Amino acid sequence: MDPDALRQVMEELIPFNKFLGVRAVEIDRGRVRIEVPFRPELIGDPLRQAMHGGVISMLADTAGGAAVWSALDEPRARVSTIDMRVDYLRPGRQETLVAEASLVRLGRRLGVTDMRLFHPSAPGDAIATGKAVYNIVIPRGAA
């Protein structure tokens, strides 16, 4: 998929992403880097002021799906999550969260990705890692 079209879908056309402020930082074929800026509504643990785990898993899933989509030539293809595992390694702090995803395998109907999430201030310290499997549907009559 064209990187500019994928960026528009992720940032503007998916209401949930738009609500959270998801930004596509880098899009290459089979590899994406996206981020969500911190805001107080994203806190899930008020005692530690840690980011909600749902925000972390959402960003992992969005990055993984985008990595699959970025490798597809058919712009009308649909990508949906079949299975996803997220390992939470440390609390997310009150700052921008970044997710990098890379395509591990792309088949006709399935895509597999690895994801890594971190803060820009400490890129070597993973907040979470993940692996996901996505279903790919190419509409009838498409290439």
Give the ranges of each region predicted by the language model.
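Hydrophobic alpha-helical segments of small multi-pass membrane proteins
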Residues: 54-58, 62, 83-88, 115-118, ...
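Hydrophobic beta-strand-centered segment that forms part of the acyl-chain substrate-binding groove
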Residues: 67-98, 103
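HotDog/MaoC-like acyl-thioester-processing domains
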Residues: 92-94, 98-143
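Catalytic strand-loop segment that frames the active site of acyl-thioester-processing enzymes
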Residues: 23-50
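A generic structural signal for short beta-strands and their flanking turns/coil linkers
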Residues: 20, 30-32, 78-84, 95, ...
